[in-house]
């Protein structure tokens, strides 16, 4: 979909959805679309249309809802001038050839499954005002290599970046308080991550991140729960430091995890722990407490932090 306005203030449409435009936006049925008619459009539904580019639609000045679900030939989108549009649920669902998109600067959230299965998308600039990234927002964006999450984001939904198999690095801003289940699951190229201090729960977060070597926590971490196999099958992870605030731990199938530095003075409750051949380092004043706690099965592996 692409069009231009000429001096007569009429829209000229091009591409494979010309008839759709005239059928839906030409209110007076004169075979033309005026700027007034275009400004009255709040929703455009192009689901499953065979379009390749979506540019020049800034003239729909009051456009709020755009649906491009399953537009499998779509490659390029420019929404920079559509200041009222929302990046809604499933907006570009399985647009597998989408490789370039420009988003409007004033959006506040990325909807659920908005870019699900956009496997050709290599990069995306998320506007600074965004505060929430929804469930499965970028699930299966297998060409996405790096992404900067804006500083105002506070919530990253379940499976938000799951199966982003080329993702090597990601910046999680300090304001984030919640990271959903499997948010980074099966990100097999991800090598390092830093968890902001306001996050209190990590649940099944990094399963199958086979290249993850470094996990760090911001100073003053308020993390309480590391559960549901948070690092399941993280084969490259050999060492980890557990913040002093942690109260409960589930960890399994970290087959190469050799050193665990556990800083809580009160031993965290151990629900499920299927790791072998590791050394657990704990505060010296808490050595006996750990050996007589739910960690007692690993009595001989517990040593003091030097």
Predicted regions and their residues:
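Intrinsic-disorder-associated, low-complexity terminal segments enriched in Asp/Asn/His/Tyr and depleted
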Residues: 4-8, 106, 158
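Disulfide-bonded cysteine-rich modules in secreted/extracellular proteins
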Residues: 10-21
């Amino acid at each position: 979909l692409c069009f231009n306005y000429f001096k007569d203030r009429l829209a000229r449409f091009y591409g494979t959805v010309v008839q759709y435009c005239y059928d839906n936006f030409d209110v007076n049925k004169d075979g033309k679309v005026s700027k007034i008619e275009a400004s009255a459009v709040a929703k455009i539904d192009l689901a499953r249309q065979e379009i390749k580019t979506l540019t020049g639609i800034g003239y729909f000045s009051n456009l709020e809802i755009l649906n491009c679900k399953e537009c499998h030939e779509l490659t390029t989108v420019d929404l920079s001038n559509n200041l009222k549009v929302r990046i809604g649920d499933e907006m570009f669902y399985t647009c597998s050839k989408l490789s370039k998109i420009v988003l409007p600067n004033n959006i506040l959230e990325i909807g659920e499954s908005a870019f699900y299965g956009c496997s050709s998308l290599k990069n995306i600039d998320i506007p600074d005002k965004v505060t929430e990234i929804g469930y499965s927002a970028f699930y299966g964006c297998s060409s996405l290599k790096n992404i900067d999450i804006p500083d105002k984001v506070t919530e990253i939904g379940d499976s938000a970046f799951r199966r982003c198999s080329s993702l090597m690095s990601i910046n999680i801003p300090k304001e984030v308080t919640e990271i959903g289940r499997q948010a980074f699951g099966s990100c097999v190229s991800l090598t390092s991550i830093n968890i902001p201090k306001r996050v209190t729960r990590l649940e099944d977060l990094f399963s199958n991140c086979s290249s993850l070597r470094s996990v760090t926590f911001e100073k003053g971490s308020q993390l309480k729960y590391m559960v549901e196999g948070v690092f399941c099958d993280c084969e490259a992870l050999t060492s980890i430091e557990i913040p002093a605030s942690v109260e409960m731990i589930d960890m399994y199938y970290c087959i190469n995890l050799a050193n665990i530095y556990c800083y809580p003075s009160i031993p965290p409750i151990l629900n499920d722990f299927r790791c072998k051949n590791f050394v657990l380092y704990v505060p010296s004043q808490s050595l006996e407490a750990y050996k007589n706690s739910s960690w007692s099965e690993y009595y001989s592996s517990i040593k003091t932090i030097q």
